[in-house]
Amino acid sequence: MTKHGKRIRGILKNYDFSKSYSLREAIDILKQCPPVRFDQTVDVSIKLGIDPKKSDQQIRGAVFLPNGTGKTLRILVFASGNKVKEAVEAGADFMGSDDLVEKIKSGWLEFDVAVATPDMMREVGKLGKVLGPRNLMPTPKTGTVTTDVAKAISELRKGKIEFKADRAGVCNVGVGKLSFESSQIKENIEALSSALIKAKPPAAKGQYLVSFTISSTMGPGISIDTRELMAS
């Protein structure tokens, strides 16, 4: 049997595809999967009971993961004047104004998150078709459009992440690394689920957390019992 086949067989020993697990059980299953040569990202995919086509049922926000993401972010700041210096001193990786806008228009996207000062949004808004689908567009709702550039950068470095429901009403979010302690992964997921529950639109009816799946980069997608998350 090939190495790939052996890996799949090893995963299936610990996992029943037809079952929903507690959060702790699911994390343990991911950790018991045959190892790979890199530190895998732990992702969650949450199907929400919303109609994202309606403006009053769109979900977007930000939350602090108490244990961070385990990822070194490449932070870009759209700014001019003294705010460029502030961005440099705060540790931004890329900063600029019209020059960055033009660079992104030409296809460059080597960054993970963007911050912008309000005066830059007229130009940054022209990048909507590029940044929007990639969830890279700065927005006041998540604190990435701000005059306090240093604070925004500091929060991102400390584990602040954005979440957004796509056109199918699904949020896909990285919540840490598989090398984290199980308790750290669990705490991060609970922080995210709590933020999502608080962000429930008043117009959304019926079951809100329709499904909740946790996976690692090379591991299976494991269904979580949503009742645990609603109660936490």
Curated annotation (Swiss-Prot):
GO terms for cellular component: large ribosomal subunit. The keyword Repressor applies. Transmembrane segments: none annotated. SUPFAM superfamilies: Ribosomal protein L1. Coiled coil: none annotated. The keyword Ribosomal protein applies. Belongs to the universal ribosomal protein uL1 family. Part of the 50S ribosomal subunit. This is Large ribosomal subunit protein uL1.
